[in-house]
Every structure is written in structure tokens, then in C-alpha cells.
């Protein structure tokens, strides 16, 4: 069973320095049909203008993954972490008992395009933490690359939840498959380009909630970048 979340039905807004689209209810945008899916709570697609950014703000009890599609994003937090997130990097911040951070576009000429993902943790009160790893394009080209998991398998960043996040880059006509255990669920997000998901056409920004499907076949209709979540 698949339920499509069309890109043009997402919430969001344009604030000059920030253009954002919300797959699920977030801040002032609320849709009772789209409050999240399983442990997946937020997928925000953001475009941050040159020299724009989010000032220091708090989070609690959330696993936050930032995935940059183009440009670069500067991160600073109350743990003393300072880093720049580049395209293809996987960054995980465990908010746990509480963390404060800021995010900014350090470029004076180029916007940064990113996905920010929130996953509910397996329990409250985790120790706050930060992890960032690079996942080269070659490792994602034509195949799924695991970038986040509960046990840090295959060099992925570690999250406090029974969930996995895969990414693939596909050329037009290229196809990948992924199998799921009967009790698992999946969410697919088209970050760039277009694909056919088990024959269903999806475009950039579209998502799909998937249950009771043992196998997914994703075929690119154009150059595409796709995120796939395996969820309990």
C-alpha cells in the first residue's frame, strides 16, 4: 500500500532569506492527515539565501539529520561543535536532554539547499550528541548507500531509533530495488529529479508512505537523488 504526498500540497512559506516546504505538520502549518509517519516526524526542504541562517535555538528529544543537496551549511552548537556540512554529508544531532544550535549559509553568493529530517527517539533523555560523516557520490551512484542507522552499520551515522536512511543517485533509466520485512514500513522522498516507484511516477519534492510492500523498485525518469527510510 502506498500513499503519495505530492510536493505541491506541502506546507511552508517564503520569508526572503528562507524558502521552506514541510512534508509534515511543522510550526504554523498543521494538517491532521500529515503529522508524521511512524517515527519519522519532519522532512523540511529548505533553501537558505546567501548569508542567511537560523539563529541559536533549542531542541529536545529528537534525532535530527541534515542532508545538504547543494551549497554548504555552517553548524554551531552548545556542545562546542563547529562544522560545515557539504553536499552528500550526513549530519546527525541528538537533541536528547537539550541542545542549542545555529545554522547559517556562510556563502555571500550561493544559496544552500537542504533537507532537515527529524526522527522521534526510542526514549527521552538521551545524552546530547553530534556526528557528521561524508558519503561520496560514487558510493551512492546506482545503489542505495546506508547513511543513518540504529547501530552505525556500514559507517553510517548512529541514531537512537529503529530506523535506517538510505540515499541513491540515479541516471535516467537506471533502476534499484529494496526489499522489506513484512512488519517494516518505508518512506521515500524524491530530493531531486523524478522516478517511478513500483510504476507510480514521482517528481522532485514528492514523498510516499509505504506499508505492506515487500519490494520496492525505483526507476529514474531523469537524473535523480532519492532518500529511502526503513521504519519500524
Identify the role of each PLM range:
Residues 1-232:
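Jelly-roll (double-stranded beta-helix
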